[in-house]
């Protein structure tokens, strides 16, 4: 099955967050898909964590290397459609890119973000749990 994976899923795995084991278990044997903005959002998230002193500088590079080992199919982002979702639900565009991808591909969404889960359910996207 194809699963749309949110940025926080990749970050959780790379940083050995408590959700890592469950994420690996429920995605094993499935194809991960994400919008083509994923690498940029991961880079932004890692440096934001560094700026907040949640990650050391050297941890940013090592987390990026771990993320690069996770197979993911990057798909074109329909920004216009995603902006419509962002405006309708008062979201950041980055969150809407993943919702648009899941909606467009009719695939379930895997995210740790409870707000995204709520919006996904509201627009008829299945949450992969």
Q: Which stretches of residues belong to each language-model region?
A:
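Short, well-structured N-terminal submotif of metal-dependent ribonuclease cores
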Residues: 1-37, 49-61
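Acidic, PIN/NYN-like endoribonuclease modules and their adjacent C-terminal/linker elements
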Residues: 2, 35, 99-129
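Structured helix-beta-strand junction loops
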Residues: 29-30, 70, 105, 123
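Active-site neighborhoods of divalent-metal-dependent phosphate/nucleic-acid chemistry enzymes
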Residues: 69-115
